[in-house]
Amino acid sequence: MLNTFTIKERGSMGKIYKNEQLSDELIKIKHRGKIYTPDYLVKIILNQGNYVDGNINKKHVIDNSCGDGQFIVHIVDRYVNDFFKHSNNISELKNQLETYIHAIEIDKDEINTCIDRCNKLVSAYGIENVNWDFINGDTLQIDKFNNKMDFVVGNPPYVRVHNLNDNFNSVKNYLFGNGGMTDLYIVFYEIGIKMLNQTGILSYITPSSFFTSVSGTNMRNYLLDNNLIESICDLKHFQAFNATTYTIKLIKIK
Protein backbone atom coordinates (compact mmCIF):
# COMPACT_ATOMS: atom_id res chain seq x y z
CA MET A 1 0.00 0.00 0.00
CA LEU A 2 1.27 3.43 -0.92
CA ASN A 3 1.16 5.45 2.29
CA THR A 4 2.53 8.93 1.60
CA PHE A 5 3.74 11.08 -1.27
CA THR A 6 5.60 14.35 -1.23
CA ILE A 7 5.57 16.42 -4.42
CA LYS A 8 8.40 18.48 -5.81
CA GLU A 9 8.93 20.32 -9.09
CA ARG A 10 11.95 19.47 -11.19
CA GLY A 11 11.88 21.72 -14.23
CA SER A 12 11.27 20.04 -17.56
CA MET A 13 11.39 16.60 -15.96
CA GLY A 14 7.91 17.22 -14.58
CA LYS A 15 6.66 16.27 -11.13
CA ILE A 16 8.72 13.98 -8.94
CA TYR A 17 6.73 11.89 -6.47
CA LYS A 18 8.83 10.40 -3.69
CA ASN A 19 7.29 7.48 -1.88
CA GLU A 20 8.19 7.04 1.79
CA GLN A 21 6.75 3.62 2.42
CA LEU A 22 5.23 0.76 0.39
CA SER A 23 3.93 -2.57 1.60
CA ASP A 24 6.39 -5.44 1.52
CA GLU A 25 5.02 -7.98 -0.97
CA LEU A 26 6.89 -11.00 -2.29
CA ILE A 27 6.91 -11.59 -6.02
CA LYS A 28 8.86 -13.87 -8.31
CA ILE A 29 11.49 -13.25 -10.94
CA LYS A 30 10.20 -14.22 -14.35
CA HIS A 31 12.44 -15.64 -17.04
CA ARG A 32 13.31 -13.39 -19.95
CA GLY A 33 13.86 -10.53 -17.52
CA LYS A 34 10.23 -10.09 -16.55
CA ILE A 35 9.01 -9.93 -12.98
CA TYR A 36 5.51 -10.46 -11.68
CA THR A 37 4.03 -7.16 -10.57
CA PRO A 38 2.00 -7.17 -7.33
CA ASP A 39 -1.61 -6.01 -7.51
CA TYR A 40 -1.07 -2.82 -5.56
CA LEU A 41 1.58 -1.62 -8.03
CA VAL A 42 -0.57 -2.55 -11.03
CA LYS A 43 -3.37 -0.40 -9.62
CA ILE A 44 -1.01 2.51 -8.99
CA ILE A 45 0.39 2.33 -12.53
CA LEU A 46 -3.06 2.19 -14.13
CA ASN A 47 -4.26 5.06 -11.97
CA GLN A 48 -1.15 7.10 -12.74
CA GLY A 49 -1.76 6.51 -16.44
CA ASN A 50 -5.37 7.69 -16.02
CA TYR A 51 -6.83 4.35 -17.07
CA VAL A 52 -9.74 4.92 -14.70
CA ASP A 53 -13.55 4.97 -14.70
CA GLY A 54 -14.91 7.52 -17.13
CA ASN A 55 -11.77 7.45 -19.27
CA ILE A 56 -11.81 3.84 -20.47
CA ASN A 57 -14.70 3.28 -22.88
CA LYS A 58 -13.59 2.74 -26.47
CA LYS A 59 -9.98 3.59 -25.63
CA HIS A 60 -7.18 1.38 -26.98
CA VAL A 61 -4.83 -0.03 -24.34
CA ILE A 62 -1.86 -2.40 -24.62
CA ASP A 63 0.60 -4.21 -22.41
CA ASN A 64 3.39 -5.05 -24.85
CA SER A 65 5.10 -7.54 -22.52
CA CYS A 66 2.05 -8.90 -20.75
CA GLY A 67 3.43 -12.07 -19.21
CA ASP A 68 0.65 -14.08 -17.58
CA GLY A 69 -1.69 -11.10 -17.72
CA GLN A 70 -1.25 -9.30 -14.42
CA PHE A 71 -1.94 -5.90 -16.00
CA ILE A 72 -4.37 -7.19 -18.63
CA VAL A 73 -6.65 -8.86 -16.07
CA HIS A 74 -6.94 -5.57 -14.17
CA ILE A 75 -7.54 -3.74 -17.46
CA VAL A 76 -10.32 -6.13 -18.49
CA ASP A 77 -11.90 -5.85 -15.05
CA ARG A 78 -11.86 -2.05 -15.23
CA TYR A 79 -13.22 -2.04 -18.78
CA VAL A 80 -16.13 -4.35 -17.88
CA ASN A 81 -17.09 -2.37 -14.79
CA ASP A 82 -16.91 0.94 -16.65
CA PHE A 83 -19.01 -0.45 -19.54
CA PHE A 84 -21.82 -1.65 -17.27
CA LYS A 85 -22.24 1.86 -15.92
CA HIS A 86 -23.79 2.92 -19.23
CA SER A 87 -24.90 -0.31 -20.95
CA ASN A 88 -25.95 -3.93 -20.32
CA ASN A 89 -25.40 -5.08 -23.91
CA ILE A 90 -23.25 -8.20 -23.50
CA SER A 91 -22.74 -8.62 -27.25
CA GLU A 92 -21.44 -5.07 -27.58
CA LEU A 93 -19.16 -5.52 -24.56
CA LYS A 94 -17.66 -8.65 -26.11
CA ASN A 95 -17.02 -6.73 -29.33
CA GLN A 96 -15.34 -3.89 -27.44
CA LEU A 97 -13.12 -6.25 -25.43
CA GLU A 98 -11.92 -7.73 -28.73
CA THR A 99 -11.38 -4.29 -30.26
CA TYR A 100 -9.81 -2.11 -27.57
CA ILE A 101 -7.68 -4.36 -25.34
CA HIS A 102 -4.37 -5.57 -26.78
CA ALA A 103 -1.38 -7.55 -25.54
CA ILE A 104 1.92 -9.03 -26.72
CA GLU A 105 3.96 -11.76 -25.03
CA ILE A 106 6.85 -13.78 -26.43
CA ASP A 107 6.26 -16.78 -24.16
CA LYS A 108 3.45 -19.01 -25.45
CA ASP A 109 2.64 -20.53 -22.06
CA GLU A 110 2.38 -17.09 -20.50
CA ILE A 111 0.07 -15.67 -23.19
CA ASN A 112 -2.14 -18.75 -22.86
CA THR A 113 -2.33 -18.21 -19.12
CA CYS A 114 -3.26 -14.58 -19.75
CA ILE A 115 -6.07 -15.66 -22.08
CA ASP A 116 -7.33 -18.22 -19.57
CA ARG A 117 -7.39 -15.64 -16.78
CA CYS A 118 -9.29 -13.14 -18.90
CA ASN A 119 -11.77 -15.79 -20.07
CA LYS A 120 -12.44 -16.81 -16.49
CA LEU A 121 -13.02 -13.19 -15.49
CA VAL A 122 -15.51 -12.33 -18.25
CA SER A 123 -17.34 -15.67 -18.06
CA ALA A 124 -18.70 -14.52 -14.72
CA TYR A 125 -20.62 -11.89 -16.70
CA GLY A 126 -21.94 -14.38 -19.25
CA ILE A 127 -19.35 -13.51 -21.90
CA GLU A 128 -17.88 -16.47 -23.77
CA ASN A 129 -15.57 -17.12 -26.74
CA VAL A 130 -13.86 -13.74 -26.75
CA ASN A 131 -11.40 -13.43 -29.64
CA TRP A 132 -8.79 -11.53 -27.66
CA ASP A 133 -6.27 -9.43 -29.56
CA PHE A 134 -3.39 -11.01 -27.67
CA ILE A 135 -0.32 -11.81 -29.76
CA ASN A 136 2.26 -14.50 -29.01
CA GLY A 137 5.29 -12.84 -30.59
CA ASP A 138 8.42 -10.73 -30.23
CA THR A 139 7.52 -7.13 -29.44
CA LEU A 140 10.77 -6.00 -31.07
CA GLN A 141 9.41 -7.21 -34.42
CA ILE A 142 5.80 -5.95 -34.15
CA ASP A 143 4.74 -2.50 -35.35
CA LYS A 144 1.00 -2.96 -36.10
CA PHE A 145 0.06 -0.97 -32.98
CA ASN A 146 2.19 2.08 -33.76
CA ASN A 147 0.40 5.44 -33.44
CA LYS A 148 -2.84 3.74 -32.36
CA MET A 149 -2.79 3.37 -28.58
CA ASP A 150 -4.49 5.62 -26.04
CA PHE A 151 -2.67 3.81 -23.23
CA VAL A 152 0.54 1.80 -23.06
CA VAL A 153 1.13 0.23 -19.65
CA GLY A 154 3.24 -2.44 -18.07
CA ASN A 155 6.46 -3.70 -16.57
CA PRO A 156 8.95 -4.21 -19.44
CA PRO A 157 11.56 -6.99 -19.32
CA TYR A 158 14.92 -6.23 -17.71
CA VAL A 159 17.64 -7.95 -19.73
CA ARG A 160 21.16 -6.62 -20.25
CA VAL A 161 22.18 -6.41 -23.89
CA HIS A 162 24.93 -9.02 -23.58
CA ASN A 163 22.28 -11.57 -22.51
CA LEU A 164 20.01 -10.95 -25.49
CA ASN A 165 21.58 -13.51 -27.83
CA ASP A 166 19.63 -13.43 -31.12
CA ASN A 167 17.98 -10.09 -30.30
CA PHE A 168 21.24 -8.16 -29.86
CA ASN A 169 21.17 -6.60 -33.34
CA SER A 170 17.44 -5.88 -33.14
CA VAL A 171 17.94 -3.94 -29.92
CA LYS A 172 20.89 -1.98 -31.31
CA ASN A 173 18.74 -0.87 -34.26
CA TYR A 174 16.60 1.20 -31.89
CA LEU A 175 17.65 4.76 -31.04
CA PHE A 176 17.27 4.16 -27.30
CA GLY A 177 19.24 0.90 -27.52
CA ASN A 178 22.15 2.24 -29.53
CA GLY A 179 24.45 3.33 -26.74
CA GLY A 180 26.54 1.63 -24.08
CA MET A 181 25.60 -1.66 -22.44
CA THR A 182 21.89 -1.08 -22.79
CA ASP A 183 19.01 -2.95 -21.21
CA LEU A 184 15.92 -4.28 -22.98
CA TYR A 185 13.56 -2.19 -20.83
CA ILE A 186 15.08 0.99 -22.33
CA VAL A 187 14.13 -0.16 -25.83
CA PHE A 188 10.60 -0.90 -24.61
CA TYR A 189 10.25 2.81 -23.83
CA GLU A 190 10.93 3.60 -27.47
CA ILE A 191 8.53 0.89 -28.61
CA GLY A 192 5.85 2.12 -26.22
CA ILE A 193 6.22 5.74 -27.29
CA LYS A 194 5.87 4.71 -30.93
CA MET A 195 2.63 2.92 -30.08
CA LEU A 196 1.00 6.06 -28.63
CA ASN A 197 -1.45 8.12 -30.62
CA GLN A 198 -1.28 11.92 -30.43
CA THR A 199 -3.02 12.06 -27.04
CA GLY A 200 -1.78 8.72 -25.70
CA ILE A 201 -0.24 8.05 -22.29
CA LEU A 202 2.50 5.58 -21.37
CA SER A 203 2.82 4.37 -17.79
CA TYR A 204 5.63 1.91 -16.95
CA ILE A 205 7.38 0.64 -13.88
CA THR A 206 11.09 0.16 -14.61
CA PRO A 207 14.57 0.45 -13.11
CA SER A 208 15.86 3.99 -12.72
CA SER A 209 19.30 3.32 -14.23
CA PHE A 210 18.52 5.20 -17.46
CA PHE A 211 18.60 8.48 -15.50
CA THR A 212 22.37 8.25 -15.04
CA SER A 213 23.76 5.48 -17.25
CA VAL A 214 25.61 5.95 -20.52
CA SER A 215 23.16 3.52 -22.13
CA GLY A 216 20.29 5.82 -21.17
CA THR A 217 21.77 8.91 -22.88
CA ASN A 218 19.75 8.71 -26.10
CA MET A 219 16.57 8.05 -24.17
CA ARG A 220 17.12 10.92 -21.73
CA ASN A 221 17.88 13.35 -24.53
CA TYR A 222 14.81 12.29 -26.50
CA LEU A 223 12.46 12.57 -23.53
CA LEU A 224 13.81 15.98 -22.55
CA ASP A 225 14.02 17.40 -26.07
CA ASN A 226 10.40 16.41 -26.70
CA ASN A 227 9.19 17.33 -23.19
CA LEU A 228 7.52 13.93 -22.79
CA ILE A 229 7.83 13.16 -19.08
CA GLU A 230 4.66 14.06 -17.23
CA SER A 231 5.48 12.53 -13.84
CA ILE A 232 7.81 10.18 -12.01
CA CYS A 233 7.06 8.18 -8.88
CA ASP A 234 10.44 7.43 -7.34
CA LEU A 235 10.52 4.39 -5.04
CA LYS A 236 14.05 5.37 -3.99
CA HIS A 237 15.80 2.47 -2.23
CA PHE A 238 12.62 0.56 -1.46
CA GLN A 239 12.84 -2.83 -3.17
CA ALA A 240 9.39 -3.26 -4.71
CA PHE A 241 10.60 -6.56 -6.12
CA ASN A 242 12.36 -8.42 -3.33
CA ALA A 243 14.42 -10.64 -5.61
CA THR A 244 16.06 -7.70 -7.37
CA THR A 245 18.47 -4.93 -6.43
CA TYR A 246 17.03 -2.35 -8.82
CA THR A 247 15.84 1.05 -7.71
CA ILE A 248 12.49 1.55 -9.37
CA LYS A 249 10.57 4.43 -10.87
CA LEU A 250 7.01 4.66 -12.16
CA ILE A 251 7.20 6.79 -15.29
CA LYS A 252 4.31 8.55 -16.99
CA ILE A 253 4.90 9.80 -20.53
CA LYS A 254 2.37 11.90 -22.37
What is the meaning of each model-derived region?
Residues 56-58, 98, 148-149, 199:
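A general structural motif
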Residues 59, 101, 134, 151:
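Hydrophobic "anchor" residues on beta-strands that sit immediately upstream
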Residues 115-142:
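S-adenosyl-L-methionine
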Residues 100, 131-133, 228-231:
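Conserved beta-strand segments of alpha/beta enzyme cores
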Residues 30-31, 35-44, 65-73, 80, ...:
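Signature of N6-adenine DNA methyltransferases within the class I
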Residues 1-96, 102-117, 121, 143, ...:
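Class I S-adenosyl-L-methionine
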Residues 97, 135, 246:
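Residues that flank catalytic or metal-binding motifs in active/ligand-binding sites
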Residues 55, 95, 128, 225-228:
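Short, structurally constrained coil/turn elements
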